[in-house]
């Protein structure tokens, strides 16, 4: 299994670059950057990271086809791929928080993602393109350079139709936050529909899962509040899908939690999110995160590998008193040796 990490853009730019260098030295496969509204710009930071690293993979997870025109994304990502040949990938998904961009209304992600990827790939071939899609429109344009490298294109989701789209046209699929076999098998069932539609096989794609990770000192240690908060936001962002799945994911769903899922307001207010965290069953929490002692984390990652997950992209949640860098070092020393493919040392070069 390949083990990668991700930044949400919260740390300073200097600290981000230091984290990328640290992750490379520790043997992580990739350091991805979230494309969140409105944190620090991922394109600027990933471009800088190409100069402060030499081996580690880089890229975006997750971007969307609406916030930036896909032609501009094609231009920027091909430029980045030239800076770090073979190391850059894009993970595209449905996006979120469009309420801050009133001109984006009624997005249909399956259609938008398909159209965006089609246009980007055509532009990367050097073609002059006119594209008249439902969401993506482009008139008689082409890149004014011949890309010397192009990024790999993955699709991320936990919704059935987008997972199927990933199987159909993606070079990889990033499963959104499922960390146990039932969730992975659910996702694989929908990915298989896309593979079948396109007459592809599992050998044609890479299967990844996004997981929230915290290492505890003791099995009975209380789960830190920060990872509860992060995981609950992931759950709530796919409320409809998760409501339909809760009984497949866990056997400890309470009537009170089920009632909350059906009756709570469709909002992100502090009160609603606090109730969600309070009511969330431990089994549901474990289905979307990896929390435990080093031995427990190793066992959980091995169980994911056993059902076909080839890469985990971790969002690291340090415990109180611990920094992200501390957790990366702890993961590298206590987890990676037991589960991860090790990088080839000849891939390194000295970077100032």
Set out the residue ranges of the language-model regions:
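N-terminal beta1-alpha1-beta2 module of alpha/beta enzyme domains
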Residues: 1-61, 151, 346-352
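Active-site mouth loops of central-metabolism enzymes
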Residues: 2-14, 63-70, 147-158, 213-216, ...
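Hydrophobic faces of well-ordered beta-strands that scaffold small-molecule active sites
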Residues: 3-7, 31-33, 58-61, 88-92, ...
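Short, acidic/polar
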Residues: 11-23, 76, 157-165, 294-303
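Acidic (Asp/Glu)-rich catalytic clusters
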Residues: 24, 46-57, 77-88, 167, ...
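Conserved, mostly hydrophobic/aromatic
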Residues: 27, 49, 80, 120, ...
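Alpha-helix-loop-beta-strand connector modules within alpha/beta enzyme cores
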Residues: 43-63, 67, 123, 328-346
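An alpha-helical appendage that flanks or caps ligand/catalytic pockets
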Residues: 107-143, 184-303, 341-352
């Amino acid at each position: 299994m390949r083990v990668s990490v991700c930044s949400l853009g919260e740390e300073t730019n200097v600290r981000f670059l230091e984290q990328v260098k640290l992750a490379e030295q520790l043997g992580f496969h990739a350091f991805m950057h979230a494309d969140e509204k409105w944190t620090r710009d991922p394109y600027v930071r990933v471009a800088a990271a190409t100069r402060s690293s030499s081996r580690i993979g880089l890229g975006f997870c997750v971007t969307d086809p609406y916030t930036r025109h896909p032609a501009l994304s094609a231009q920027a990502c091909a430029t980045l791929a030239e800076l770090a040949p073979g190391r850059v990938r894009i993970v595209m998904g449905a996006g979120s928080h469009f309420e801050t961009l009133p001109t984006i209304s009624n997005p249909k992600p399956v259609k938008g993602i398909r159209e965006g990827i089609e246009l980007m790939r055509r532009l990367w071939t050097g073609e002059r393109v006119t594209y008249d899609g439902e969401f993506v429109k482009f008139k008689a344009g082409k890149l004014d350079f011949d890309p010397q490298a192009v990024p790999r294109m993955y699709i991320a989701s936990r919704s059935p139709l987008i997972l199927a789209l990933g199987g159909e046209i993606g070079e990889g699929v990033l499963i959104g936050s499922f960390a146990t076999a039932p969730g992975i098998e659910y996702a694989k069932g929908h990915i298989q529909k896309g593979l079948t539609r396109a007459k592809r096989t599992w050998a044609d794609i890479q299967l990844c899962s996004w997981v929230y990770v915290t290492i505890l000192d003791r099995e009975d240690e209380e789960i830190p509040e920060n990872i509860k908060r992060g995981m609950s936001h992931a759950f709530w962002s796919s409320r409809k899908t998760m409501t339909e799945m809760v009984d497949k994911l866990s056997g400890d769903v309470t009537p009170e939690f089920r009632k909350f899922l059906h009756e709570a307001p469709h909002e992100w207010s502090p009160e609603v999110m606090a109730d969600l965290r309070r009511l969330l069953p431990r089994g549901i929490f474990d289905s979307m995160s990896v929390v435990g002692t080093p031995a427990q984390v190793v066992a959980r990652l091995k169980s994911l590998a056993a059902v076909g997950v080839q890469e985990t992209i971790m969002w690291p949640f340090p415990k109180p008193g611990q920094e992200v860098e501390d957790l990366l070092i702890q993961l590298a020393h206590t987890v990676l040796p037991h589960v991860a493919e090790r990088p080839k040392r000849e891939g390194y070069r000295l970077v100032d």
